[in-house]
Amino acid sequence: MTQTLSQLENSGAFIERHIGPDAAQQQEMLNAVGAQSLNALTGQIVPKDIQLATPPQVGAPATEYAALAELKAIASRNKRFTSYIGMGYTAVQLPPVILRNMLENPGWYTAYTPYQPEVSQGRLEALLNFQQVTLDLTGLDMASASLLDEATAAAEAMAMAKRVSKLKNANRFFVASDVHPQTLDVVRTRAETFGFEVIVDDAQKVLDHQDVFGVLLQQVGTTGEIHDYTALISELKSRKIVVSVAADIMALVLLTAPGKQGADIVFGSAQRFGVPMGYGGPHAAFFAAKDEYKRSMPGRIIGVSKDAAGNTALRMAMQTREQHIRREKANSNICTSQVLLANIASLYAVYHGPVGLKRIANRIHRLTDILAAGLLKKGLKLRHAHYFDTLCVEVADKAGVLARAEAGEINLRSDILNAVGITLDETTTRENVMQLFSVLLGDNHGLDIDTLDKDVAHDSRSIQAAMLRDDEILTHPVFNRYHSETEMMRYMHSLERKDLALNQAMIPLGSCTMKLNAAAEMIPITWPEFAELHPFCPPEQAEGYQQMIAQLADWLVKLTGYDAVCMQPNSGAQGEYAGLLAIRHYHESRNEGHRDICLIPASAHGTNPASAHMAGMQVVVVACDKNGNIDLTDLRAKAEQAGDNLSCIMVTYPSTHGVYEETIREVCEVVHQFGGQVYLDGANMNAQVGITSPGFIGADVSHLNLHKTFCIPHGGGGPGMGPIGVKAHLAPFVPGHSVVQIEGMLTRQGAVSAAPFGSASILPISWMYIRMMGAEGLKKASQVAILNANYIASRLQDAFPVLYTGRDGRVAHECILDIRPLKEETGISELDIAKRLIDYGFHAPTMSFPVAGTLMVEPTESESKVELDRFIDAMLAIRAEIDQVKAGVWPLEDNPLVNAPHIQSELVAEWAHPYSREVAVFPAGVADKYWPTVKRLDDVYGDRNLFCSCVPISEYQ
């Protein structure tokens, strides 16, 4: 049969690239589960009353090449001015060896959060290095493995200060008036829901204020002034006030550590260490505190522990602080950090080492000194005598200066009264400084760089003597070895080889949606048109970004059934928080601010109650029935009991149990009947897109995990993106921004993230995914995700019972395998199965969530039938091994499961196990072997002997 030209053009080619099973494989699986077609299977599983009659109109699919060309044309509308705006964002030089071998490498960016440490030792080591950088530069005892951004870290510092404060009756938080405005914005938003009063004043006036539990200072103020706060901090400490200091990571290379000055908490952005500005993100924040406060710290902490053989190994420490365990009592709701960006920053420090970092910092400072000297020589005045990289220059003809800057494609900071701000960075050259002289002084300034350099080299007083660092930094061998590109390349590869990512095997984590992150989707994030824009540049320079964001928002509106989308939240947890704030402010606008009860099903993810608590709500748990569904009788009773105090319900759909609940619309109706709003958690949108939608179901607001459903990679634990979709009545209450108000910013509400559009530079990934898939591809992706999950469930249910099913015994896009009966019968646990899967070359499914003693499997649509069968065969082989234990062939205390995973060194050691080496490391069906580098970790040892910095030099000998 002759094909048409349209068929030969094959605009939907990417759909077949993204979806793992081909048509023949899909039919085989449909036959196996007893369904005639994808539509028939969907019709059986999804409740009829929520099925869309027509798919969302997001356009036809495009090929990878057509989509890239289209997005390139949009990106070209961005204007790449040289930005000296500062305010916590600077241009960088990302070393090409890190760009190519990490940022562009799926071995790094497709990995998951290192909850399974045995398959995560590489990125755990890189994160431990990040913590060591933080400890050395801040002078404190404990560091986290990153937070979402500097402003969020400030809000977390405030919350932590209250937790650890001995002044229990104090309720005021003092913020120095020269912190970055976006930091103050986010702090104020968080303080409102916690009921704190924020005082903003000159730092030296802090002692004039009473009932203050915590203080936020900025070591290098937003307009550039270096502050010596030693005496002030000492006085504050004598009054038992918790002191937090925001610091510049590059300035800390030269400046004294705030911890040495007495600070309790130090934080800042690590963006300057090699991470492009990207119109606001993603960037990792660093966060450090005194040892006595370690159990009150937010975020993940990497600790040094031991494995079963006594070898040094790394793991995430003190996980009992986290939201998935502590729920509303957690230190923070954050479950995504910025691992990929933290690792870029850590490897930037490894590559440059202390000598290289000092050279960079000194060069930036020298050029700033030269610029200052020239301006002073010509009669201009500087607001501050002490500075690192930022000058606040008083100008008589500010409009003229800004006009000349614009003509030279230069951005200066323009929001300072009668002055401009100029922040230099590692990309600044002597030619740039000469251009700045011309902008500020005119072309005939007559200044010479070399002459000025001689003057300032011998007489620089711009950093106070007391503020110069007098201790060594980064003395650990890891920062003093890998400085040639060859060594660095091999070090990074050695780390990558320790980890298991999607480039090696399926990662069947339930509730995580570890789908393909296609190369074509990733390419645009490193385009300079997207990577180099400052988030506070004039709007007319970011027209490409605005077009791309507006188009993506429009698509998401259509896919979710909502009326508006806000892109600011830079993680799913932030999206939850922002959505709940919108509900809170909506109620307040109706004089119903007393509505503060949030209903949450017992099956919910721990982030839900943690977010509700952060939003100032009381959590009331709604029971689930024996089938895992929301108990409608209990829901009605709890809603009626809450009455006029009911704020909302947080519900996940399909449920966290992996089932399309038949009564979801009734749930929405009950909550609306009592004046509440419905927050539908978007974590499981991968089973909704094109089939149903939150808005159609009846919800009022949802966050969308773009790092799940819409293909932003997990990055080993971040970045994420959590934009929120809202119905029209909530649109006026989504986050705004104090610095940037442009079209696309829907409101004047407070911010939840530092940048107006959150992690804007990764939004092209989701844009590309939707553009290449089109409406038909997106629906098919959801359908195949459902098919793959049901295929696994049907083939494994005899060996491992599926805990919850919906109509006709079907599941949604994931299934829960119940290990409890086997554990009771044989003593083999879900943990043993998870670790044994490593020997078979797989990352484990989600363990003990949402039900203890289970494994939750989510295959996604991207995995082929071949890979699904490989996983199924591994699980069936493991079941046969369990039967061997049950039959007494292998003792419970010594068998391949309890000893898993097995490592290479065991093969050449004395072997005393009742099973062979071959059974241990090459079990049935394993051909392409993944080798873990450590055995099972000792979690108890790690938490009892908390050690969160680089291991001693002796470990390298």
UniProtKB/Swiss-Prot annotation:
An annotated GO cellular component: glycine cleavage complex
EC class of the enzyme, as a word: oxidoreductase
Catalytic activity, as annotated: N(6)-[(R)-lipoyl]-L-lysyl-[glycine-cleavage complex H protein] + glycine + H(+) = N(6)-[(R)-S(8)-aminomethyldihydrolipoyl]-L-lysyl-[glycine-cleavage complex H protein] + CO2
Keywords: Oxidoreductase, Pyridoxal phosphate
One GO MF term attached to the UniProt entry: glycine binding
Transmembrane segments: none
A GO biological process held by the record: glycine decarboxylation via glycine cleavage system
Cofactor names: pyridoxal 5'-phosphate
SUPFAM superfamilies referenced in this protein's UniProt entry, alphabetically: PLP-dependent transferases
The EC number(s) this enzyme carries: 1.4.4.2
Pfam families xrefs: GcvP2_C, GDC-P
Stored CDD domains: GDC-P (cd00613)
Modified residues (N6-(pyridoxal phosphate)lysine): 708
Family statement drawn from the similarity comment of this UniProt entry: Belongs to the GcvP family.
Subunit organization: The glycine cleavage system is composed of four proteins: P, T, L and H.
Task of the protein: The glycine cleavage system catalyzes the degradation of glycine. The P protein binds the alpha-amino group of glycine through its pyridoxal phosphate cofactor; CO(2) is released and the remaining methylamine moiety is then transferred to the lipoamide cofactor of the H protein.
Identification of the protein by name: Glycine dehydrogenase (decarboxylating)
Provenance organism: Escherichia coli O6:K15:H31 (strain 536 / UPEC)
